Amino acid sequence: MNAHDLIQEIIERKGKVENVFWIACGGSMIDLMPANELLKREATTFTSTVYTAREFCLMAPKSLGPKSLVIACSHSGNTQEVVDGCEMALAAGAEVVAMTDCEGSKIDNGKWTTWVYPWGKGESQAEVPQGIGVLMAAELLDQQEGYEALADMYAGLKQMDALLPAAREKVNAELGDRFAELCQQHKFFYILGSGPNFSQTYAMAICSLMEMQWQHCCYIHSGEYFHGPFEATEPGVFYFVQLGSGECRPMEERALAFLNTHTDTVMVLDALEYGVGDVPASVRSYLEPIFFYNMSCELRAARGKVFDHSPEIRRYMGIEQY
């Protein structure tokens, strides 16, 4: 399955798409956010919205209908809220595409198009949800409106594949041990980011650290930092800054300048120091979250070693009834 042919088939079968809804939960929803950001910014003849799946079901958009494209993701394939969202969308006449890592799971039931993807550190970024999502978004843009950066998107994903191995080594060598040490020293800390990268600011907090490390932390949008949260800044408080290389970098730089003079514990992960600046500027903002996700994986693993806490351990998820 590939994004170009899939989108072409949908348009031929259903006609012009008028709205796109991205639905998932947790890390799977986060994977869809950069694609939504691409469409929010670039699309002029249709709309795009991302939903956590339960909210999509409880507050179903009135615009959901035969001209809608619903793109869902459930890594396990068994997230009931996502399956329910797909069922609701199908009943409304929408075109449904569901992504999953698990063939034969609840979501891979033959009722809609299912894209079963591989998973693992060695997989191409174009073959996993973040990459699949931005490619579907880019193809939809191109086939309905024209998208000059389509070739850059494909090329940029290949560049991400090329730069990630060295980036993983670098972040472990330069930040891994110190990050784990700071987690020992600070029971709570803040993570800042913005733009499409904010998906991974959110992800680092709720997935890599709260879910996988039971680490108390909070995410803050860099653009919102000066509209309330900066009042809590003081010496002894740890801040982790995701410094992107795209259009929103000035927001992070402004926040970082304030942090450097008002607290004594700041760690910066600067995408430009890891080769991300070589990715075409036209698409970099939408691909950079891939970089921050992969670096978060390395940092949570570094913390896990020091705390003897495997990222695979859960105490509630899939164990208790909730």
Describe these PLM feature segments.
Residues 2-6, 55-62, 226-229:
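Structural motif
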Residues 15-151, 156, 194, 242-267:
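Glycine-rich phosphate-binding loops that contact phosphosugars or nucleotide phosphates
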Residues 64-67, 130-135, 233-235, 279-288:
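Short, surface-exposed amphipathic charged segments that create phosphate/polyanion-binding patches used
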Residues 103-115, 229-232, 276-285:
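Glycine-rich, charge-decorated loop segments at or immediately adjacent to ligand/cofactor-binding or catalytic sites
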Residues 50-52, 101, 216-224, 266-275:
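A generic structural motif
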